[in-house]
Amino acid sequence: MRVYEGARELRIACKHDDLLPSLREYDPHQETCEIECGISVKRFCRGTEKCGEEVLAHIEDGVDIWRILLTADVSIAEIPVEILKKQDMVLVYRTNSEEQLAEYVRPLFSLQKREPCEAVCYPAVFCFANVDAAKEFIHFIGWQMLADVQVIDIDFDDVIKAFASQRGHILCISQKMLIPQEELSAQDAEVQGALLIFRGDEQLSIYEVCGQAEELSRSFHESADIIWTIEMCHERSVTALLAKRLSD
């Protein structure tokens, strides 16, 4: 279990502010909205992790700050380069074909830099099959960043390595609601990364979740990177974010 202390801030930018989730269910101490280069930026502030070495955010004046940009693939070229470069994550959702998604995303890789002390390149680029999958990922990030206590301690290096796209290795992330209605298919078994999000109230059994996670993990190829987490909420569900490689 991980416990946060101090101040932390999540900044989510999007040209269309109606797509930005509020994350109010995670009870941020402050939520504000500002405009930067014509782009809406929502800021969620909450009280830095005691052991901050795993936080992949810039630290300014003692505040852990994590910057995320959400954009459609067709809008990438309209975003100023200075905005793209300062992000920790750029989330791109598909509006047409997978081939066009890959074409729009490729220029982002030339903006990436790797600091000597870091294992990944920034901004990390994540590609999604649709905007709903991207928003589900944002909710996952919001829970990890804004909730004061995490039941499952997740290393975000693992998340980036499993789901971020790289030059010549573009992954497209789709969403499935395993509980209550969908099932994994034979095609899903070939994904390269899977994030399983178990949600439920205080009655949710950790032992039961571990069993479910183990059973679902057997549905994937042994080489797949599988991450699972627990989010406390009123409704019980299991959501899967699945990353498959696009032909590039």
Stretches with model-predicted labels:
Residues M1-D248:
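Tubulin/FtsZ superfamily GTPase core signature
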